Amino acid sequence: MRGEATGGIGLELGGDIERRSAELGYWLGEAFWGKGITTAAVRALTGYGFEALNLTRIFAVPFASSSASIRVLEKCGYIREGLMRRSAVKEGVVIDQVLYALTDEDFVPTSPVA
């Protein structure tokens, strides 16, 4: 895997009236699944978003069929807000996504990631 990305994570900040809100997105190569990497990264970036960027809301929209991604969000305190029916197309197939979010009022800081 030398020289290749193993995953990615980021926040896309909203603009104008949504400037204190951000969308969280992430991916991890299959060889690294099941090691807690994504959960640790989501916790760390969520903390950074609320504490350093002064966000009031962070949301994510994983595929409804992605139980592992949904579990990561739930372990990090995100709450399911709704189903986005037929909202994405992956490999030519129209699929549903789910909306998960966490607000600054519900955020519970955790210990720094070692």
Language-model features: where?
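Acyl-donor (CoA/ACP) binding surface of acyl/acetyltransferases
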Residues: 1-114
